[in-house]
A protein has these predicted regions:
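Beta-strand-rich domains and repeat architectures in extracellular enzymes and scaffolds
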Residues: 10-37
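Surface loop/turn motifs at the tips and blade-to-blade linkers of beta-strand repeat domains
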Residues: 10-15, 52-56, 97-102, 137-142, ...
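Repeated scaffold domains used in trafficking and secretory/extracellular systems
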Residues: 17-22, 57-65, 102-111, 140-151, ...
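Blade-loop segments of beta-propeller domains
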Residues: 49-66, 73
């Protein structure tokens, strides 16, 4: 059976080239530019930048975590990956810094208690404890370019970057012992990061320098 395609609600110009990280904090979008190494706080109703922040590296991914945010940051010289805590009032914490397993990892999601980190080339999502130890491995079966929790379920972009990029959005129930990953719809652009604002999903079309709002069919 051929999958339907996502329903785009809107495309908006990114305030900076190569939009990469994206998170919804309940009121605003937080976008991280890969090329400029900057973080932008966006009012989605007026589509204007409220603040600009400088992270300690490349902001590969972000997720909101109960009033703070976590960013996957690639640090020089080898783009080693760390999860860094960010508080809007005080900025990035030097103490609260988690080393990603094998210094690799990209996208983040949060279930209200634990962080989940995906590893692109290992086709998996890892559930981490507070110190960054792996407490669970969920096989996704393909490269992962974003994931987010909605109603206790994980929604995930999976596919391949090769041969022109081919992606679907899929769903799985992390409460299952061996979650079955079910594809829902085709994503017809090179999607990077996935977040949900309570009504619609959001992602970055990085190569087009656009941020996309969409719904499921």
């Amino acid at each position: 059976m051929k999958l339907p395609t996502i329903i785009e609600r809107g495309r908006f110009p990114s305030p900076a080239p190569a939009p990469q990280a994206l998170a919804w904090d309940g009121n605003k979008l937080w976008m991280g530019s890969r090329d400029l190494r900057r973080i932008y706080v966006i009012d989605p109703k007026k589509w204007e930048v409220l603040e600009e922040k400088k992270p300690p590296g490349i902001p590969w991914a972000a997720v909101a975590t109960n009033g703070t945010l976590r960013f996957t940051i690639g640090e020089d010289p080898n783009d080693d990956r760390y999860i860094r805590r960010f508080a809007p009032e005080t900025g990035f914490s030097e103490e609260d810094k988690i080393t990603c397993p094998e210094f690799t990892g990209s996208y983040l999601s949060y279930d209200g208690t634990s962080l989940f980190l995906s590893q692109w080339y290992k086709h998996r999502i890892l559930k981490l404890d507070a110190k960054g130890n792996i407490i669970r491995v969920i096989d996704i079966g393909a490269e992962v370019s974003g994931h987010t929790f909605v109603g206790g379920m994980i929604y995930v972009f999976r596919g391949t970057e090769q041969n022109g990029e081919s992606w679907t959005i899929a769903r799985l129930d992390p409460r299952e012992e061996k979650p079955k990953v079910k594809d829902i719809a085709i994503v017809p652009f090179a999607c990077r990061s996935l977040t949900f604002d309570g009504a619609n999903f959001w992602s970055n079309h990085r190569t087009a320098n656009e941020i996309v709002s969409f719904a499921l069919p």
